[in-house]
């Protein structure tokens, strides 16, 4: 009793619809990677430096650049073309590092580097010393507060954005202590305001 069993036809992987393979492409595929962002050139439009990627592609592979610009919708081209003058200038100012950080934050505006020291009266014959401006020298205020509290054996606290309050009258000693601990703060940039009201 022999029966004929038909063997199942196995489709070629090359044209298999389920695998997502394209029948018009030669395998293995050759993918062109961008020299700026190191992604395939089709994905450059999703990076923050689109104009740099486009310039690199236009310079090194003009035929691929022509294909990509023809495939782009008019909406995308208009969006890139409008801000190209200002975007080019901004590109010069910003520098992107690898790792996909995106736009780099602008640095804070530079303020004059000046440390002011003031003696403020409290109840009866008690005083507090206020030190302002250490943050302009990029000194950590928490570290400075701990240092002052340990050095003068008293309470010290960071009260404002750039203000340290030390319990006690240390206006005479604090100038020398600041210059000794942080040499970047020179004598000309320290100003003693004397006794001021709170």
UniProtKB/Swiss-Prot annotation:
Keyword hit for Cell inner membrane: no
Bias type Basic residues, positions: 95-110
Domain of life: Eukaryota
Keywords for the protein's UniProt record, in alphabetical order: Initiation factor, Protein biosynthesis
GO function terms (MF aspect): translation initiation factor activity
UniProt-annotated stretches for the region Disordered: 72-110
Pfam families for the chain: DENR_N, SUI1
GO terms, biological process: formation of translation preinitiation complex; translation reinitiation
SUI1 domain boundaries: 115-182
UniProt similarity note: Belongs to the DENR family.
Biological role stated in the UniProt entry: May be involved in the translation of target mRNAs by scanning and recognition of the initiation codon. Involved in translation initiation; promotes recruitment of aminoacetyled initiator tRNA to P site of 40S ribosomes. Can promote release of deacylated tRNA and mRNA from recycled 40S subunits following ABCE1-mediated dissociation of post-termination ribosomal complexes into subunits.
Listed name of the protein: Density-regulated protein
Species this protein is from: Gallus gallus (Chicken)
């Amino acid at each position: 009793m022999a029966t004929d069993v038909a063997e199942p036809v196995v489709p070629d992987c090359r044209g298999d619809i389920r695998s997502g393979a394209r029948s018009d492409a030669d395998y293995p595929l050759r993918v062109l990677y961008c020299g700026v962002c190191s992604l395939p050139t089709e994905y450059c439009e999703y990076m923050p430096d689109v104009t740099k990627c486009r310039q690199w592609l236009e310079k090194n592979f003009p035929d691929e650049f022509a294909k990509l610009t023809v495939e782009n919708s008019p909406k995308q081209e208009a969006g890139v073309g409008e801000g190209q003058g200002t975007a080019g200038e901004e590109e010069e100012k910003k520098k992107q590092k690898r790792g996909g950080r995106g736009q780099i934050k602008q640095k804070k505006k530079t303020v004059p580097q000046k440390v002011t020291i003031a003696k403020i009266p409290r109840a009866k014959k008690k005083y507090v010393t206020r030190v302002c401006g250490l943050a302009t020298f990029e000194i950590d205020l928490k570290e400075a507060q701990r240092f002052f509290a340990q050095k003068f054996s008293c309470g010290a606290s960071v009260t404002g954005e750039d203000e340290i309050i030390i319990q006690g009258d240390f206006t005479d000693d604090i100038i020398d202590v600041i210059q000794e601990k942080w040499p970047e703060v020179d004598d000309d940039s320290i100003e003693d305001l004397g006794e001021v009201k709170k």
